[in-house]
Swiss-Prot record:
InterPro entries for this protein: Ribosomal_protein_uL29, Ribosomal_uL29, Ribosomal_uL29_sf
Keywords: Ribonucleoprotein, Ribosomal protein
Annotated family: Belongs to the universal ribosomal protein uL29 family.
Record's protein name: Large ribosomal subunit protein uL29
Phylogenetic placement of the source organism: Bacteria, Bacillati, Cyanobacteriota, Cyanophyceae, Synechococcales
Gene Ontology biological process: translation
RNA-binding found in the keyword field: no
Length: 72
């Protein structure tokens, strides 16, 4: 996984790929929390990066679903 995936790259994904990516990032976030609790985490900046990516994907997913509803 690249740390600097941009919204441009996310826009290329379809809705099922977006949902899969969200699930994967949430699992990564869970793993980071677990590592932090056991004091094994050295890269605390990863929290911010992953949370930002999840927010971008959720926003993109919502806007895609709204555009599909309005076109119907």
């Amino acid at each position: 996984m690249k740390n600097s995936e941009s919204i441009k790259e996310f826009k290329k994904l379809n809705s099922s790929e977006i949902n899969e990516k969200i699930d994967q990032l949430r699992k990564d976030l869970f793993d980071l929390r677990f590592k932090q609790a056991t004091r094994q985490l050295n890269e605390t900046h990863q929290f911010k990066i992953i949370k930002k990516q999840v927010a971008q994907l959720l926003t993109l997913s919502k806007s895609q679903s709204n555009s599909q509803k309005s076109s119907d």
